[in-house]
């Protein structure tokens, strides 16, 4: 059975008037995923669950209605089909970031018309809740006024970016690097978040499926298929093109505000695995959502987080997890503009499996 591994770090940072001191500790927690070796926690996998009853696509029957891939065997075939391994050379560590050209950055800059910026990070959650098993910790020292932040950012609560060494499939990372070659106690020797040191500046597109359906939020477990994306393109008058960043709003934070937190790791709206080929065909360079991207249960028998695996490990796509897209959705609707300049710049920790980020959308 295919094995997937998740890697993560715990971050402690001390800020003072005289400088910044940081330390990065390898998480002591381990997860076992379908026979995987010990791994870290973002998003923290759950034991494989029985297949969920089939669910119809949001907009009725269509090419994705067959829900391919449906099981581990089909997933393995699909992984090979959509893989970008070797596309930018056998030593590549940037993945789909290669799709963001100078011309693409200029196009993104041209989208700034009114100069209004919207931050996409959700405020750190300091309480232990069903969707936040690793609360953000903040302590302050009196006198010289220094403080310490401690955050295990991978998971279902804190806004962060996943590096390309975060997930392995069958013992390999993106571009075919082996687990033995990449994983060390001091971080990843390949594909670490430092490869994103110059950040992302590109055209961002908000995919607002609740607005498409005329609801405030999608119910947990709702899958988003290719036909849903294309229906939104038609409604919004936009088309996803090479080098774009695609952000999926499911309304997770709106639902949380209305009904309270729930165990998102077991039941969340998100993309179905069948969207991976479309993402490759359109040349999407960065992907994210207001949750952990995958629909859960996954609708792929015996597999958890198949979209994460396909995006990071097959396509070489960095992922923005747990973004707060509520204000962005409101501003986009107000302006009737669903495209904007998106900038994302994680701290370039050498060997890091990711980092907390506050992505900025500018209209």
Predicted regions and their residues:
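Sec-dependent N-terminal signal peptides
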Residues: 1-27
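Active-/binding-site microenvironments in catalytic and ligand-binding cores
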Residues: 30-363
């Amino acid at each position: 059975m295919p094995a997937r591994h998740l890697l993560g770090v715990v971050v402690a940072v001390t800020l003072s008037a005289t400088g910044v001191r940081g330390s990065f500790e390898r998480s002591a927690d381990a997860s076992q995923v379908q026979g995987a070796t010990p791994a870290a926690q973002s998003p923290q996998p759950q034991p494989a669950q029985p297949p969920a009853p089939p669910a119809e696509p949001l907009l009725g029957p269509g090419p994705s209605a067959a829900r391919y891939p449906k099981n581990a065997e089909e997933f393995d075939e699909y992984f090979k089909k959509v893989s970008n391994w070797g596309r930018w050379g056998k030593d590549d560590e940037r993945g789909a970031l290669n799709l963001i050209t100078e011309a693409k950055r200029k196009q993104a800059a041209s989208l700034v018309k009114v100069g209004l910026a919207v931050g996409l990070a959700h405020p750190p959650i300091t309480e232990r809740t069903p969707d936040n098993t690793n609360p953000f910790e903040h302590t302050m020292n009196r006198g010289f006024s220094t403080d310490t932040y401690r955050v295990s950012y991978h998971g279902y609560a804190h806004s962060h970016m996943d590096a390309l060494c975060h997930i392995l499939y069958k013992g390999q990372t993106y571009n075919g690097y082996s687990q033995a070659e990449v994983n060390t106690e001091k971080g990843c020797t390949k594909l670490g978040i430092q490869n994103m040191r110059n950040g992302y500046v590109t055209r961002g597109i908000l995919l607002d499926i609740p607005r498409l359906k005329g609801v405030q939020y999608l119910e947990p477990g709702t899958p988003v298929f290719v036909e849903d994306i294309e229906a939104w393109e038609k409604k919004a008058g936009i088309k996803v093109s090479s080098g774009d960043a695609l952000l999926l709003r499911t309304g997770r934070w709106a639902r949380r505000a209305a009904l309270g937190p729930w165990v998102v790791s077991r039941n969340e709206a998100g993309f179905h695995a069948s969207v991976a080929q479309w993402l490759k065909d359109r040349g999407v360079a960065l992907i994210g959502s207001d949750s952990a991207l995958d629909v859960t249960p996954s609708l792929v028998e015996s597999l958890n987080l198949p979209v994460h695996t396909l995006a990071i490990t097959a396509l070489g796509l960095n992922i923005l997890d747990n973004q707060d897209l509520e204000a962005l959705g409101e501003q986009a609707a107000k302006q009737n503009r669903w495209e904007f300049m998106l900038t994302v710049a994680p701290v370039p920790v050498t060997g890091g499996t990711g980092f907390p980020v506050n992505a900025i959308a500018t209209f």
